[in-house]
Amino acid sequence: VGQVSQNGKIIKVAKAPGMKYTHYAPKVDTVTAVNIDHAVNEYDKQASLGKNPVIVARDIYRDTVKDRNLISLGVTVEDYTRNIYSALHTAEKEYDYIIVEELHGSGLEASVMNRVTKAAGGKEV
């Protein structure tokens, strides 16, 4: 954010459109998980504290997540991209702690993770 003088008053101006508006963030605590093992450990920790957590991840992790709450993002990175925001909206209505699978890579993965990281307020497990 930069400063500009207008009519003798200093005002702040966004340097880029992405800085102008706040991005969507769930109203409940949300974190990203480096890998599915971290997600499961965080889930178990939060459940032991009395929270009602959910893991938001792709189907490839269904066997690892087992009987824990899971909102599926589909199979592919493209599915993840299409489904992430509707999954977050659903999660914040039904659960009080959201753990989101991180994607690793460049291109589409990095672009999506930029938004997901902002939605989680930069919190990672």
Where are these regions (language model features)?
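A conserved active-site cap/scaffold subdomain adjacent to cofactor or substrate pockets
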Residues: 1-4
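NAD(P)-dependent aldehyde/semialdehyde dehydrogenase
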Residues: 11-13
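A C-terminal functional module that forms or caps the active site or interfaces directly
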Residues: 15-121, 125
